């Protein structure tokens, strides 16, 4: 099988040296992502496209899906590459490929041509289109808004029969811009802002301020791992978890109620800036949107920025909540966010929307900054690729099994799309489908007299969810790894 990768248009308008660098990085990213599916595949870069050739037909759908989620790719063409002799030969091959697809449909033919030929692209379009119209009685030519567009590419003596076109996410390849550190809470905003920076070519590391115990961290790990695995797995990234409960306790004890929200955000920026400096990261990323909550007024955002020299990026600053939720739905983090507890909003009962710098600084004079230094020093830094392994070590009380008993039911926790693409069937045991993002609200509705064997393809999400369910008091869960 063969795929032609078309570059994001902004890459094609760069200078020659920058364009070549971007294409080289994108080629490497594609190799890093696809090697998990087929180690023998070939990735070949050209000036205006990248070719991916693979032998394992069983991985066709998985490879195609992975390509649509790699930043820097505008669209993917799934093609059949065949030799041709003349225009009539092109027509015959197009007829064999598209006859069934064009039955009873309107169509047009579009041709791109490279190399020296005795014919032009328009001549091929007319010849092939006329031939298809004559030989398929129920088909009809329509040049504007047809039901089917027959895409053909002619390159020297080769004909590319385009079997399908699939849109990518666009943007710049990860690694073409510098690293950033996303302050992730697991909610709608931070997930979307992290995705937007990945799409713009940044390697995104994650910094999580834990205010709600182990269950909260497990939930946020799931979001971060999902984002990385889906859009950024071409690169190694860090997940830094900071236990911020001592800081919150100090704020509650020492800071005036109305100033707590701004002071907390200033402490978070101070801590994140220390982490960024430690790892050579150039900017912080937050999901703040102007006026969304009390701490996100211009006055308060300016005061928050003042505590650090580190650049703070706010890609959602002008977005409304509905737009953010729609984006979360598109990238697959909406259901995570809906079940994620929110802790920051309850810290202050009467928050100020226009904090005064002198008053904030006076309140902070009462704060013991050694507490902040200590929690940053004790921060837990995990390689995102090791989250699966670390989770496996943490889930010591959850048994992993490869077989099943009479009372066992396999619970397929993959997303609905994954289940539809590759349904799980295991002989001798019932399989129930419940996507991972619904477990927190729907698992209790299942028959609790059964033992539920959680399963996902790679075993990462099943272990995380098993730990979460154990934290919630469910003892009838195991991890199924055949």
UniProtKB/Swiss-Prot annotation:
Disulfide bonds join 344-456. The lineage of its organism: Bacteria, Pseudomonadati, Pseudomonadota, Gammaproteobacteria, Enterobacterales. One of its GO terms (cellular component) is cytosol. GO terms for biological process: thiamine biosynthetic process; thiamine diphosphate biosynthetic process; thiazole biosynthetic process; tRNA 4-thiouridine biosynthesis. This is tRNA sulfurtransferase. It is found in: Cytoplasm. Belongs to the ThiI family. Catalyzes the ATP-dependent transfer of a sulfur to tRNA to produce 4-thiouridine in position 8 of tRNAs, which functions as a near-UV photosensor. Also catalyzes the transfer of sulfur to the sulfur carrier protein ThiS, forming ThiS-thiocarboxylate. This is a step in the synthesis of thiazole, in the thiamine biosynthesis pathway. The sulfur is donated as persulfide by IscS. It catalyses: [ThiI sulfur-carrier protein]-S-sulfanyl-L-cysteine + a uridine in tRNA + 2 reduced [2Fe-2S]-[ferredoxin] + ATP + H(+) = [ThiI sulfur-carrier protein]-L-cysteine + a 4-thiouridine in tRNA + 2 oxidized [2Fe-2S]-[ferredoxin] + AMP + diphosphate; [ThiS sulfur-carrier protein]-C-terminal Gly-Gly-AMP + S-sulfanyl-L-cysteinyl-[cysteine desulfurase] + AH2 = [ThiS sulfur-carrier protein]-C-terminal-Gly-aminoethanethioate + L-cysteinyl-[cysteine desulfurase] + A + AMP + 2 H(+). Keywords: ATP-binding, Cytoplasm, Disulfide bond, Nucleotide-binding, Redox-active center, RNA-binding, Thiamine biosynthesis, Transferase, tRNA-binding. It comes from Salmonella paratyphi B (strain ATCC BAA-1250 / SPB7). Pathway: Cofactor biosynthesis; thiamine diphosphate biosynthesis. Gene3D superfamilies: 3.30.2130.30, HUPs (3.40.50.620), Rhodanese-like domain (3.40.250.10). The active site is at residue 456. Pfam families: ThiI, ThiI_fer, THUMP.
């Amino acid at each position: 099988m063969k795929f032609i990768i078309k570059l994001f248009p902004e890459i094609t308008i760069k200078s020659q040296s920058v364009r070549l660098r971007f294409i080289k990085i994108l080629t490497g990213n594609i190799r890093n992502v696809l090697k998990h599916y087929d180690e023998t595949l070939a990735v070949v870069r050209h000036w205006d496209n990248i070719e991916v050739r693979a032998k394992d037909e069983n991985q066709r759908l998985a490879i195609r899906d992975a390509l649509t989620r790699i930043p820097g790719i505008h669209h993917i063409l799934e093609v059949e590459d065949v030799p041709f002799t003349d225009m009539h030969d092109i027509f015959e091959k197009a007829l064999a490929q598209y006859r069934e697809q064009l039955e009873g449909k309107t169509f047009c033919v579009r041709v791109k041509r490279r190399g020296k030929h005795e014919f032009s692209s328009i001549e091929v379009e007319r010849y092939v289109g006329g031939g298809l119209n004559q030989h398929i009685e129920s088909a009809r030519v329509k040049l504007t808004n047809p039901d089917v567009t027959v895409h053909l590419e002619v390159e020297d003596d080769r004909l590319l029969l385009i079997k399908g076109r699939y849109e990518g996410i666009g943007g710049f390849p990860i690694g073409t811009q510098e690293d950033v550190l996303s302050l992730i809470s697991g909610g709608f905003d931070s997930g979307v802002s992290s995705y937007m920076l990945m799409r713009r070519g940044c390697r995104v590391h994650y910094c999580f301020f834990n205010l709600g115990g182990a269950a909260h961290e497990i939930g946020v790990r799931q979001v971060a791992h999902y984002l990385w695995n889906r859009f950024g797995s071409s690169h190694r990234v860090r997940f830094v978890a900071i236990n911020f409960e001592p800081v919150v306790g100090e704020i509650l004890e020492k800071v005036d109620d109305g100033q707590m929200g701004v002071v907390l955000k200033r402490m978070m920026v101070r801590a994140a800036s220390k982490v960024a400096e430690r790892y050579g990261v150039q900017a912080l990323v937050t999901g703040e949107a102007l006026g969304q909550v009390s701490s996100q007024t211009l006055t308060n955002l300016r005061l928050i920025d003042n505590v650090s020299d580190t650049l703070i990026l706010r890609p959602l600053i002008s977005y409304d909540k509905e737009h953010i939720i729609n984006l979360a739905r598109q990238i697959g983090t909406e259901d995570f966010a809906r079940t994620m507890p929110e802790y920051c909003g309850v810290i202050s009962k009467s928050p100020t929307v226009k904090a005064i710098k002198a008053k904030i600084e006076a309140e902070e004079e009462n704060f013991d900054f050694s507490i902040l230094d200590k929690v940053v020093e004790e921060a837990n830094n995990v390689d995102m690729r090791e989250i699966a392994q670390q989770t496996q070590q943490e889930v010591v009380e959850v048994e992993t099994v490869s077989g099943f008993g009479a009372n066992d039911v396999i619970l397929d926790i993959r997303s609905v799309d994954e289940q539809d693409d590759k349904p799980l069937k295991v002989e001798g045991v019932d399989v129930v489908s419940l996507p991972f993002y619904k477990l927190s609200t729907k698992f209790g509705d299942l028959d609790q007299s059964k033992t539920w064997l959680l399963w996902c393809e790679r075993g990462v999400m099943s272990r995380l969810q098993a730990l979460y369910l154990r934290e919630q008091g469910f003892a009838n869960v195991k991890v199924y790894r055949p």
